[in-house]
Amino acid sequence: RQLARVPFVFCASPAYLKAHGTPQQPSDLGGHRGLLHRFPTDGRPLRWGLLKDGQRVDAALPPSMVCDDIDALATLAAAGAGITRLAAFVAEPYLRDGRLQAVFGADTAWRPEPMEVYFCVSDRRDFTAKIRALFEHLQAGIAPAWRV
């Protein structure tokens, strides 16, 4: 069952965007430095999905740095190293104080694809009353915390 949807933000420092331009559509990302997050289990970079009018596009962004530490990516982006994709709850303090600026903001029809988080059990019979209570507790606490 779906536990939560994690909104994402594509962002970079104002200085980086002033020097390199602000992308308006996914194809504009090709000339930018990408700060990519990778899966710790197999090293694959996470895809940068964008949505517009019900269509999904994977942005092609050349990586200048790939790591599995989202806080490091936020710090690198704030220092002007490139454009990154951050969970909104990670990006929010940087956006609020101006260290980062959203790339695909309200003035564009493109939106970063959210990540869906699921609660899984191996068999329906394993979804006992205690497990259901845990699921409901997590759903009530996590979903609002991840909305920004």
Positions of PLM-derived features:
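C-terminal effector-binding regulatory domain of bacterial HTH transcription factors
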Residues: 92-93, 97, 106-148
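Flexible hinge/capping segments at coil-to-helix
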Residues: 2-37
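Residues that form or flank phosphate/diphosphate-binding pockets in enzymes
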Residues: 20, 45, 129
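Secondary-structure junction motif
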Residues: 34-53
